């Protein structure tokens, strides 16, 4: 079980982008979260029993923070990588796909994506990051685990056919396979 001290130390070591990734994976969205907001969210999840040590470890792994796995959780990142290759993820294929796309888009792509969807999202909530854009689109029911058409359309508009194909490939198994809940261990 992750202690409050470990959670606070993890939170202190994460940058703004990493904080957003961890919260996205945990199904909590706070755009550009502050340290206090992240600590509060992690504590609340722990108190609710929704944040376990293995879940935190996979979050940090997916956020690319192998240093924190090693230094704070005392896990060998290579061990965790091998373990995750042989077991189901805590996260849905949709979350992992969104995270993959987030890592592949440059700042210019994200600005273009936001500009192209400005009429759809509206001016009251202008996203600053890709994950914030995803959150806005999900709130409008235009994007979700069973509907990635808007994302693929936007990637096509950005001339990122490479990413569009990757999304199709990553989500293809999910959309055509058995029910969503059978693909991953649980939704945090």
UniProtKB/Swiss-Prot annotation:
SUPFAM superfamilies the record matches: DEATH domain
InterPro entries the UniProt entry points to: DEATH-like_dom_sf (IPR011029), DED_dom (IPR001875)
Signal peptide (UniProt feature, chain positions): none
Keyword entries, A-Z: Activation of host NF-kappa-B by virus, Apoptosis, Host-virus interaction, Inhibition of host apoptosis by viral FLIP-like protein, Modulation of host cell apoptosis by virus, Repeat
A Pfam family this chain is assigned to: DED
Gene3D superfamilies the UniProt entry points to: Death Domain, Fas
CDD domains for the chain: DED_Caspase-like_r1 (cd08776), DED_Caspase-like_r2 (cd08775)
GO biological process: regulation of apoptotic process; symbiont-mediated activation of host NF-kappaB cascade; symbiont-mediated perturbation of host apoptosis
Subunit structure, interactors included: Interacts with host RIPK1, TRAF2, MAP3K14, IKBKB, and IKBKG. Interacts with host CADM1; this interaction is essential for chronic NF-kappa-B activation.
Role according to the record: Plays a role in the modulation of host signaling pathways by acting as an activator of both the classic and the alternative NF-kappa-B pathways. Thereby, initiates an important range of cellular processes to promote cell survival, proliferation and protection from apoptosis.
Protein name, per record: Viral FLICE protein
Source organism of this protein record: Human herpesvirus 8 type P (isolate GK18)
């Amino acid at each position: 079980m992750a202690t409050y001290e470990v959670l606070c130390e993890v939170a202190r070591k994460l940058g703004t982008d990493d904080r957003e990734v961890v919260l996205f994976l945990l199904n909590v969205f706070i755009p550009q979260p502050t340290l206090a907001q992240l600590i509060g969210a992690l504590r609340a999840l722990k108190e609710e029993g929704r944040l376990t040590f293995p879940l935190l470890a996979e979050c940090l792994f997916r956020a690319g923070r192998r240093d924190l796995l090693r230094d704070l959780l005392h896990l060998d990142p290579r061990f965790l990588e091998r373990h995750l290759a042989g077991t189901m993820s805590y996260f849905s294929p949709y979350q992992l796909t969104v995270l993959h796309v987030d890592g592949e888009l440059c700042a210019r792509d994200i600005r273009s994506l936001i500009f192209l969807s400005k009429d759809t999202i509206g001016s009251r909530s202008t996203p600053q990051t890709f994950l914030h854009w995803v959150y806005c689109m999900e709130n409008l029911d235009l994007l979700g685990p069973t509907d990635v058409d808007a994302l693929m359309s936007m990637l096509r508009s950005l001339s990122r056919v490479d990413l569009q194909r990757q999304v199709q490939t990553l989500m293809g198994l999910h959309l055509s396979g058995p029910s969503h809940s059978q693909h991953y261990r649980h939704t945090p």
